[in-house]
Amino acid sequence: MPWTRRHLLTLEELSREEIDQIHATAAAFKRTLSRRVKKVPALRGKTIVNLFLEPSTRTRMAFDMAAKRLSADVISFDAASSSTTKGETLHDTAKNIQALGADMIVIRHAAAGSPLYLSRILDIPVINAGDGAHEHPTQGLLDTFTMKEHLGSLKGRKIVILGDILFSRVARSNIHALTKLGANVTLVGPATLVPHWFTDLGVEVSHDLRTALADAEVVMLLRIQHERQSSGHFPSLGEYTSMFGLNKTRASWLNPKAIIMHPGPINRGVEIDSDLADGDHSVILEQVNNGIAVRMAALYLCAGGQPENVAPIE
């Protein structure tokens, strides 16, 4: 089916077929990234602005690289030296970026709903690179893309997401993608960070780590989001680690072929021990690498490209 969306704002609104289309497009682009010449001319002549109003390492660099691999011109917005420090609103900033001739905006913002707002006031495509604790759609797409590379179909697979679910936009995007792809998802962590109402999203909630990890084929660790918490949700990091940190003993409860994932940044020794983060079952750096191809797919499709046209570009 043809791709018809101009914006990528949330995985909640995508169908399983659309997620599969993005993954298939990403797989085609990933093949181009293994060549000696890694660029394709898909977005030549287009200007993409990365409007990051929250700190980022992996996502910002991956969007930069993805746009350049597509031959687009890229402008990365530096909030610290911009007029936002003088009180300019997001509305005015975005309108001025469009007036300067940008063809697409990739936005990260602390306020949930910011990408949706821009999609309503601008005439150019908008991609959500993370909005508050709401969603991080390209992270959910690259995570599920990585899982499919290792497991094939995710239908019926046992996936555990462990950590700060309440404040995690990554968790929400993964929940939407995984449930649409047929996975059995269990959320694990302290009751204060994994409230029971998450079951309304079609997942299981557990506060018993051993039971949750038993035979899981994927475990995704999430860091504690101190910057989004206004009050303590557990006594200390040490207590969190003692109850829910992933170490070798607890990893032995997983399926023997399980993969270990983390969207980063990692708090080593808190949610995961270093020997596991760097071990044979870890696919954390594969996630980072896959982020380029997946974001190439998102940029290409939102710019008007079609999945079936990627192969000739190769």
From Swiss-Prot:
TM regions (residue ranges): none
Binding site for L-aspartate: K86, R169, R223
InterPro entries: Asp/Orn_carbamoyltranf_P-bd (IPR006132), Asp/Orn_carbamoylTrfase (IPR006130), Asp/Orn_carbamoylTrfase_sf (IPR036901), Asp_carbamoyltransf (IPR002082), Asp_carbamoyltransf_Asp/Orn-bd (IPR006131)
Its job: Catalyzes the condensation of carbamoyl phosphate and aspartate to form carbamoyl aspartate and inorganic phosphate, the committed step in the de novo pyrimidine nucleotide biosynthesis pathway.
Name recorded for this polypeptide: Aspartate carbamoyltransferase catalytic subunit
Superkingdom to which the source organism belongs: Bacteria
Reaction(s) the record says it catalyses: carbamoyl phosphate + L-aspartate = N-carbamoyl-L-aspartate + phosphate + H(+)
Uppermost EC category: transferase
